[in-house]
């Protein structure tokens, strides 16, 4: 039985798939299985995968296009490893990624997942020195990072190695999400386990024109669902974090909820969320300004953000 199951999600990235696959083969830690999950690609991905002669490669082809998280759940059902790695077919791992993550997990049973530092690359594999998705490569400390995950998704999916036990206890990914299901999954894990972080850049996230992260309308719908789901959970953390930290986190989550409500065409609910955010933190001047902005046409509100 392999120690690591690598869930290699594939969808119409044949240009990048061989590079991603080779970065798996180049890992210094070799006790793994590769479960290649093709979600209905039409660009030759299936044929390329079928041509690979690797004894630890399992192929699962889905013709109905389940989406990222439904596809990952199929992979979880097939996985036999003690640890689960998620790897997108357009990203790249550096050779010691799995080795270092295994060492951290083996020595810290309280850690449920460990992620690494990294950087963004372009379609040609060159490092990006800007913030192409509007944020820096996500980083955390090792420890209890649950509140940090309220502020933003601080974990890149391809940077993660998680215990299979986490998925066995909490269930798999929520297939109702388009692009934020990994954020929701890491959040659920962080509610019950600590999160480990390796400060070495071992994961390269490729940014190109076909990234799902560019489909903003669907991402905003995801954020609306996620922020609504998080709000009632915060009260249950009262014995875990200082009240001042919880108050700021509540205010932030409500302000973010207000913004995605406005972005998705519900300005009345947005104003209510912004006002509730200000009740917890009256110093949030952006929330005051955005209450006024919700009275503007939706297209203008989007431009003002």
Which ranges hold each PLM region?
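Conserved nucleotide-sugar donor-binding catalytic segment
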Residues: 77, 135-226, 265
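N-proximal low-complexity "stem/linker" segments adjacent to membrane-targeting elements
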Residues: 1-25
């Amino acid at each position: 039985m392999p120690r690591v199951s690598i869930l290699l999600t594939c969808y119409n990235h044949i240009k990048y798939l061989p590079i991603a696959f080779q970065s798996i083969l180049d890992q210094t830690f070799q006790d793994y299985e590769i479960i290649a999950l093709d979600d209905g690609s039409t660009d030759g991905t299936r044929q390329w995968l079928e041509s690979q002669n690797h004894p630890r490669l399992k192929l699962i082809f889905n013709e109905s296009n389940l989406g990222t998280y439904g596809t990952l759940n199929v992979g979880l059902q097939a996985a036999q490893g003690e640890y689960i790695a998620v790897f997108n077919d357009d990203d790249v791992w550096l050779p010691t990624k799995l080795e270092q993550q295994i060492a951290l997990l083996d020595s810290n049973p309280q850690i449920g997942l460990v992620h690494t530092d990294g950087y963004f690359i372009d379609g040609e594999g060159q490092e990006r020195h800007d913030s192409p998705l509007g944020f820096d490569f996500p980083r955390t400390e090792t420890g209890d990072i649950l509140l940090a995950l309220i502020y933003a998704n601080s974990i890149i999916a391809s940077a993660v190695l998680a215990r299979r036990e986490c998925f066995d206890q909490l269930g798999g990914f929520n297939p109702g999400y388009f692009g934020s299901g990994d954020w929701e999954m890491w959040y659920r894990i962080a509610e019950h386990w600590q999160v480990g972080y390796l400060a070495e850049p071992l994961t390269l996230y490729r940014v190109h024109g076909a990234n799902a992260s560019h489909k903003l309308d669907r991402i905003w719908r995801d954020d609306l669902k996620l922020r609504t789901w998080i709000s009632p959970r915060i009260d249950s953390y009262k014995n875990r974090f200082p009240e001042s930290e919880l108050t700021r986190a509540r205010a932030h989550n409500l302000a973010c909820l207000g913004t995605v409500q406005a972005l998705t065409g519900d300005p009345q609910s947005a104003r209510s969320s912004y006002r509730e955010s200000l009740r917890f933190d009256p110093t949030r001047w952006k929330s005051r300004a955005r209450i006024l902005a919700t009275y503007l046409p939706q297209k203008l509100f989007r431009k003002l953000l």
